[in-house]
């Protein structure tokens, strides 16, 4: 029987071999790709989206949290936003009036993720307690904000990093976790339907940070991980990932499907956003910025979102910048961080309203801001 030292040696050799093959595959793909989206678009005479500093303005500042804002989500149909903060509360906001309709005090204050149910009647949240809690917003809360939990989803062995309801299904929810897995839940029973990763060899090998469900085909979702990869999953086949996407050189913090459902975007600690083709596995474009002028360091990408057409990519950064990228030409058309009433801290989360008319950003400065296209500006 092989000793521990021999097994470690074999494991190291196998890992080196895999990394070598992966690098050869990456180089081979680069030779086959004679262009990228930006070069092709420029060759066809496409011009950047014209943006002025007054075209996207901060129309609301949502103040009420007493700690860093970590996560936010919009309702699919109505103008409501839920936010999760280091202060241990979920707040539900009316995006039109800035009024708080709920301020839910959580049993575990270390919350990292939140999501609205498709019908807007429930919210989910998860964090360092390794559980996902469901609250029915029709339940009565006491004067301190304590509200009964309608369901607690337990089973993860690490923190819950993100959660998202399956579109148009109030009873299905997907979570990602520091235990290297994603889980599909039946919210009604509180039971796990499927586990993605874990003991399966095609799963992630480090913390899973983010998930995004394909609204065009809700059987498919992608997950981004600290193992620098993104994996595509089919909820009908949990035993293996459909495809693994390489390209990033550090943790993948955010993943988001493109509006057409055929591509998806990513944001990473390596300071770049990337666009991938879901079907071919090819990386279509890299959106890379210059280092921060003050620190000379490359800010990390914390969160991303697409405009309703997909022409714009919004990317939040650790230094407080929020870039608006032209996805076709890979050029920055606006930095919300330079505008009046911008955040004074790390952008931790952002999300686009379902009709594409407004962007909400959350920050470590304890505030959320709603950015809307000005009256004369056509929604892109």
From Swiss-Prot:
One of its GO terms (biological process) is regulation of root development. Present in the root, leaf and tassel. Keywords: Repeat, Transducer, WD repeat. WD repeats lie at residues 64-94, 106-136, 155-186, 203-234, 247-277, 296-326, 342-372. SMART domains: WD40. It holds the Pfam family WD40_Gbeta. GO terms for molecular function: signaling receptor complex adaptor activity. The keyword Repeat applies. GO terms for cellular component: Cul4-RING E3 ubiquitin ligase complex; cytoplasm; endoplasmic reticulum; heterotrimeric G-protein complex. G proteins are composed of 3 units, alpha, beta and gamma. Guanine nucleotide-binding proteins (G proteins) are involved as a modulator or transducer in various transmembrane signaling systems. The beta and gamma chains are required for the GTPase activity, for replacement of GDP by GTP, and for G protein-effector interaction. Belongs to the WD repeat G protein beta family. This is Guanine nucleotide-binding protein subunit beta.
